[in-house]
């Protein structure tokens, strides 16, 4: 009996958990700067955000997060938005609730709107006029991780983003990493115009193909963006290029010095060899310890070698050449 009781307790708790709405909502009271949680009810398979007669009149904001949108879809539970109540809020946060079109709540954007968070929904198209209104009013707007698609329907928005040239060019890489920041520094788009998660250059070509007929100016802007992107990419490589060029110059200088030294060495050796054998002089160097003395002999062939190693100032005697020997011989004859 105890096991059966425990089984039914777990079964009942599981069914109760599935019946409970998978949405957590809070309202914000600006007087004490506090968020208060309130329950969301399902009426006729429909959830209305914000809920009727649940939020006090002095609430300044609404925040709802759908924890299990798959559960709501499987059970055919739809979400409707009460735009008449939304107009009274300055802070609207509807996260992960499967919103497919921003126009569902755009009618509830009042002039006092100061914050809009629609992250993790299923937005595919953002109307140009709605986004322009949010940006002009300097409203912090978070639209990232949606499913915005390429195509003609988003051409006005695409053109608007390209016109944000100063900011857009600076954040071009981040744009393709699912983020773009507008000039008011408060509006962010993540995963904008996914195009099947195409890389940056393919995205430009793909989206431009759809929008060039309606906005011819896009072609010029895309070329500017591409050139700017390439310039920014190359700027990051400048230090490496400088280092590589410097290393190349040093290695070339080293090789040049080595080559110059080898050439000079070879040239000096060749010059020394020529001066030793082909100088044209007839003087034969003698060993200092042995000289010839011609004081007592008239003829060179009868000269006697004398040892002068003991004398400090021993004379160095000139040795006659072969021609001189021939002349002396002819004289003798």
UniProtKB/Swiss-Prot annotation:
Top-level taxon of origin: Viruses
Post-translational changes noted in the entry: Highly glycosylated.
Compartment list: Host endoplasmic reticulum membrane; Host Golgi apparatus membrane
Keyword Signal in annotation: yes
Record: glycosylation sites: 32, 39, 44, 76, 82, 101, 181, 185, 219
Leader sequence residues: 1-31
Annotated disulfide bonds: 195-237
Domain notes: Contains putative leucine-rich repeats (LRR) and a C-terminus cysteine-rich capping motif similar to domain structure of host TLR3.
Protein name stated in the entry: Transmembrane protein I329L
